Amino acid sequence: MADTASKYAVKLRPNFDNPKWVNRHKFMFNFLDINGDGKITLDEIVSKASDDICAKLGATPEQTKRHQDAVEAFFKKIGMDYGKEVEFPAFVDGWKELANYDLKLWSQNKKSLIRDWGEAVFDIFDKDGSGSISLDEWKAYGRISGICSSDEDAEKTFKHCDLDNSGKLDVDEMTRQHLGFWYTLDPNADGLYGNFVP
């Protein structure tokens, strides 16, 4: 694994038994369960990521492939695969495995799966190649992905992630806050998606 040279790489501890952590992942499971049958598949997630989000963001075929590879690796670590239906208990157990795996890499300043995904996303919406994204670029992604459908929620996310107060977001800041939000319940990452995700 490559060194990320992250200035935010510190040991973070998960809190898997906290009902808030479980509810956060239940919300995401339901968000991903497009047809509401209580099961999700990697097919559904990749279709949303590639056919919907990447296409609407104007990703090139190379960017879409890189993004799809990152999404596949991330969700396969949770235990998902093509054609395999996963119910919530297995999904949340898979998140625990993923969190432990990624947090260990993060504490060693090595590239995690969430960082790979973040880099793939940044490559798509960092249109000017500056290595950072603006609030407007983040708002566009939030609307297209559905994760920050209101400007207010997108602005809250942006503020939470702008750790160096530069008015721009880089992938290192986004990775740190997403680790804190999805993996550990770090209070510094609470409200990452505004009022949309608990």
UniProtKB/Swiss-Prot annotation:
Ca(2+) 3 binds at D162, D164, S166, K168, E173. Residues 20-55, 60-95, 119-148, 149-184 form the EF-hand domain. InterPro entries: Centrin_CML-like, EF-hand-dom_pair, EF_Hand_1_Ca_BS, EF_hand_dom. Pfam families: EF-hand_5, EF-hand_7. Coiled coil: none annotated. Ca(2+)-dependent bioluminescence photoprotein. Displays an emission peak at 470 nm (blue light). Trace amounts of calcium ion trigger the intramolecular oxidation of the chromophore, coelenterazine into coelenteramide and CO(2) with the concomitant emission of light. This is Clytin. It comes from Clytia gregaria.
